[in-house]
């Protein structure tokens, strides 16, 4: 590690220093989706996650690799990768070790289990194990048998599970993490991992964010957990197990949920009905789900929804007409929907709609009601822009921004 990097670390403000040290929770040689890190930081640093990433990058303490459009102002960070140099990661780990001579008193604790061999401090303890860390990271390899020991973790606010096995049982001691706010489960194996013992999450009164990456899961499992404090649910590259039976009303069960992100869930062909019952929802993003062919009519019940992102869903043919009931909708993204036939007939009723992103939607017909959308900004490609330019004389405040299609090789680093 060169002296410039050390000087950069020494000069960091306290909050950026903390953010840098948190990066040690992820495995080496990884390209991490920016949303993952921002979710992690949300437990301790609020909503400044993107600013912190950019500040650390400006000091050469990490690299930012865009894989798509730079529309971070909309709060969507799945199209940005973060890479940390392995030497910098080791430096961060060493700094964490200096926080306390006692493993149990460190602010951050990384537990690595290889070949089912636990560290010595886990074996035959003379007294119950109490972990006082606020950030706990557990990494296991593909041979892990999910055989856990008991421990008490009363102060853990953020939990990162780096897994590699095809089957993984969440440890029972998660239920002791009464202060837990963020759970991130990242599977580094070749195939989606089947998770079991999700019920240990149901007793966590402060859990606000859950992120699943590359796991096999039923979308019905989430409401069953009864997480009344959950604010954000994220699924990336997950295998979504079909559920035969829908749930009863979940509006009380998920009363705080404001944001759902579903990205690269390749076998998702339809959204579960319960999503339409989460009346607190403000952002719904379903992206890069190539089998999604329809959106449920009941989506019109989400009266507080402000952002609806249905981008790069290649099989999506139409949007439900009930979208015209989304009175608070400000941003609609259907970019990459090259099979989309038309926008909802009465989309012009959405008086708060400020921006539509519809790149590569050149087959989409625009209903006459779009003329009622005042101060509208449209982001699209050249061919789609032609559809809107025809309306320009009747839409004086219409802004059309043309974007070129770019092929970004950074995308290959995701897989």
Curated annotation (Swiss-Prot):
Pfam families per UniProt: LRR_14
Keyword Coiled coil assigned: yes
The organism's taxonomic lineage, starting at the top: Eukaryota, Viridiplantae, Streptophyta, Embryophyta, Tracheophyta
LRR repeat coordinates: 229-251, 256-278, 280-303, 304-326, 328-351, 352-373
Similarity comment: Belongs to the disease resistance NB-LRR family.
Entry's Gene Ontology BP terms: defense response to other organism
Function: Possible disease resistance protein.
Domain notes: The LRR repeats probably act as specificity determinant of pathogen recognition.
Origin: domain of life: Eukaryota
SUPFAM superfamilies given in the database record: RNI-like
Residue runs in coiled coils: 239-260
Keyword DNA-binding: no
Residue ranges occupied by any NB-ARC domain in the UniProt entry: 8-43
PANTHER family, per database record: PLANT BROAD-SPECTRUM MILDEW RESISTANCE PROTEIN RPW8, RPW8 DOMAIN-CONTAINING PROTEIN
InterPro entries documented for this protein: LRR_dom_sf, LRR_R13L4/SHOC2-like, WH-like_DNA-bd_sf
Keywords: Coiled coil, Leucine-rich repeat, Plant defense, Repeat
The protein's name: Probable disease resistance protein At5g66890
């Amino acid at each position: 590690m060169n002296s410039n990097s050390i000087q950069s670390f020494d000069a960091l403000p306290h909050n950026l220093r903390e953010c840098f040290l948190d990066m040690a929770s992820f495995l080496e040689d990884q390209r991490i989706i920016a949303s993952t890190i921002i979710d992690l930081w949300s437990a301790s640093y609020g909503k400044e996650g993107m600013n912190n990433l950019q500040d650390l990058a400006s000091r050469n303490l990490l690299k930012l690799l865009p894989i798509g459009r730079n529309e971070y102002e909309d709060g969507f960070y799945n199209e940005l990768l973060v890479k940390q140099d392995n030497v910098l990661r080791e430096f961060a780990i060493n700094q964490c070790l200096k926080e306390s001579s006692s493993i149990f008193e460190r602010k951050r604790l990384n537990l690595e289990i290889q070949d089912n061999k636990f560290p010595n401090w886990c074996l035959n303890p003379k007294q119950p194990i109490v972990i006082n860390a606020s950030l706990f990271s557990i990494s296991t390899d593909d041979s892990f048998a999910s055989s856990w020991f008991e421990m008490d973790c009363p102060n853990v606010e953020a939990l990162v599970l780096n897994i590699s096995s095809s089957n993984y049982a969440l440890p029972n001691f998660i239920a002791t993490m009464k202060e837990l706010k963020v759970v991130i489960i990242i599977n580094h194996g070749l195939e989606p991992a089947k998770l079991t013992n999700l019920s240990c999450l149901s007793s966590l009164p402060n859990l606000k964010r859950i992120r699943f990456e590359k796991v096999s899961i039923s979308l019905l499992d989430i409401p069953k957990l009864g997480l009344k404090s959950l604010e954000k649910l994220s699924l990336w590259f997950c295998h979504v197990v079909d559920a035969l039976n829908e749930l009863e009303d979940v509006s009380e069960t998920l009363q705080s949920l404001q944001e759902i992100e579903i990205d690269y869930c390749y076998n998702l062909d339809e959204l579960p009905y319960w999503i339409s019952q989460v009346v607190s929802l403000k952002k719904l993003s379903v992206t890069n789900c190539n089998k999604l062919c329809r959106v449920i009519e009941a989506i019109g019940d989400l009266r507080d929804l402000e952002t609806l992102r249905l981008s790069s869903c290649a099989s999506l043919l139409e949007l439900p007409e009930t979208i015209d009931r989304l009175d608070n909708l400000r941003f609609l993204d259907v970019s990459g929907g090259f099979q989309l036939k038309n926008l909802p007939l009465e989309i012009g009723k959405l008086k708060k709609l400020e921006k539509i992103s519809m790149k590569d939607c050149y087959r989409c017909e625009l209903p006459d009601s779009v003329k009622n959308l005042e101060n509208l900004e449209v982001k699209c490609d050249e061919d789609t822009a032609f559809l809107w330019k025809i309306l320009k004389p009747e839409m004086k405040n219409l802004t059309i921004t043309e974007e070129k299609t770019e092929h970004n090789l950074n995308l290959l680093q995701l897989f």
